């Protein structure tokens, strides 16, 4: 079983680590996390994560999801020819600094000064690991270095007038592998090292210039599927608008399970997308009301199963000790009118069951309905 998650930052093939002092506005938990946790805990069958996003701190992410030892393949590790697998500690003291550098410790980052001029800012992730270093010239940022949690410089981004111009993805020795230009999104491959790595075997890129990051990822991912998987393998694909087109091309004749989660049910007029849904072996949704939406779109009955992302197994050893009845209500997708009806329903229920407790559950850190509930 292979899992292709949609762990992206917006509409970019990357998922950078968050600064430790920034409140997380979007939860990391999704359907892929839950499915992988199930396979990891129960030893159901062999599985592997196929990660298409640039994730320099992927090991820390897996650790936060309690699946640190989950087997995975990283598309960007293949592109950058990274062979390292273990987390390694890299301190800012290990970097090369100019003479007479003075470090000032602030609540948010470490600021380096040279001759009383700001030279750099060192930023850290949620686990205290160094993730980025901003470099300055005359108080203006000119470069951002992104560090991998395996202990090396992974990407360097060049700025002009405080705007990113291009970014270079590096190999484990600091040599640039590809250059991504932000203005039009095109990619240039280093002609002196035009290779990527699949299972310790080097393959040559088809060309040295690509119109987009997606076309580059598609080439490398296609090679991995051809060389490392068989047509009998099963792929659980987290549907996402960013990689719809790629999945339609690469998985047309493979065994697939399509997983739709929360707001990722984006159905639009696209013949290939409709064909992918019509021909899949199974669809997974997180609520029953999405079943009719999918079948109306596909214009046929589909093999669909709705699986809640929450752990609904009863733990009788704990449940029998509780003196209250806890009711968990996910509310992110509930309309205001339905939400008000729900409050009235619970109000009547509380009149007959004094032990009931309702817990409204949201993944939105900026949820603003608290006052409306209290003053209803």
Predicted feature locations:
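Repetitive, compositionally biased segments used for assembly/scaffolding
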Residues: 92-213
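Short beta-strand->alpha-helix junction loop in the catalytic core
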Residues: 262-264, 289-290, 303-317
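Short N-terminal targeting/anchoring amphipathic segment
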Residues: 208-242
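A short, active-site helix/loop in glycosyltransferases that binds the activated sugar's phosphate group
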Residues: 272, 276-302
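N-terminal subdomain of nucleotide-sugar transferases
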Residues: 1-96
């Amino acid at each position: 079983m292979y899992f292709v998650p949609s762990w992206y930052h917006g509409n970019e093939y990357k998922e950078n680590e968050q600064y430790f002092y920034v409140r997380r506005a979007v939860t990391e938990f999704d359907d892929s996390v839950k499915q992988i946790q199930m396979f990891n805990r129960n030893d159901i069958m062999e599985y592997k994560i196929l990660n298409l996003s640039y994730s320099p701190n992927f090991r820390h992410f897996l650790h936060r999801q309690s699946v640190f030892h989950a087997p995975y393949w990283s598309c960007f590790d293949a592109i950058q020819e990274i062979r390292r697998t273990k987390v390694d500690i890299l301190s800012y003291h290990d970097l090369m600094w100019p003479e007479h550098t003075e470090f000032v410790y602030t609540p948010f980052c470490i600021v380096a000064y040279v001759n009383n001029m700001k030279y750099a800012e060192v930023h850290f992730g949620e686990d205290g690991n160094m993730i980025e270093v901003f470099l300055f010239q005359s108080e203006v940022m000119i470069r951002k270095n992104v560090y991998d949690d395996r202990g090396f410089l992974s990407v360097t981004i060049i700025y002009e007038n405080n705007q990113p111009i291009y970014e270079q993805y590096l190999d484990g020795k600091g040599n640039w592998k590809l250059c991504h230009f932000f203005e039009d999104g095109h990619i240039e491959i280093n002609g002196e090292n035009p290779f990527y790595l699949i299972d310790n075997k080097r393959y040559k890129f088809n060309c040295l210039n690509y119109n987009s990051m997606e076309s580059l990822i598609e080439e490398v991912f296609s090679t991995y599927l051809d060389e490392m998987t068989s047509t009998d393998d099963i792929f659980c694909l987290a549907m996402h608008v960013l990689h719809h087109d790629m999945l339609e091309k690469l998985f047309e004749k493979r065994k697939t399970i399509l997983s739709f989660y929360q707001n990722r049910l984006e159905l639009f007029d696209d013949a290939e997308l409709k064909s992918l849904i019509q021909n899949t072996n199974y669809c997974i949704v997180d609520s029953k009301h999405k079943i009719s939406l999918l079948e109306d779109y596909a214009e046929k009955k589909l093999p669909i199963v709705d699986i809640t992302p929450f752990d609904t197994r009863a733990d009788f050893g704990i449940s029998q000790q509780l003196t209250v009845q806890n009711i968990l209500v996910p509310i992110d997708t509930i309309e205001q009118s339905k939400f008000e009806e729900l409050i009235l329903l619970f109000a009547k229920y509380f009149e007959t069951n004094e032990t009931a407790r309702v817990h409204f559950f949201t993944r939105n850190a900026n949820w603003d309905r608290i006052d409306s509930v209290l003053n209803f």
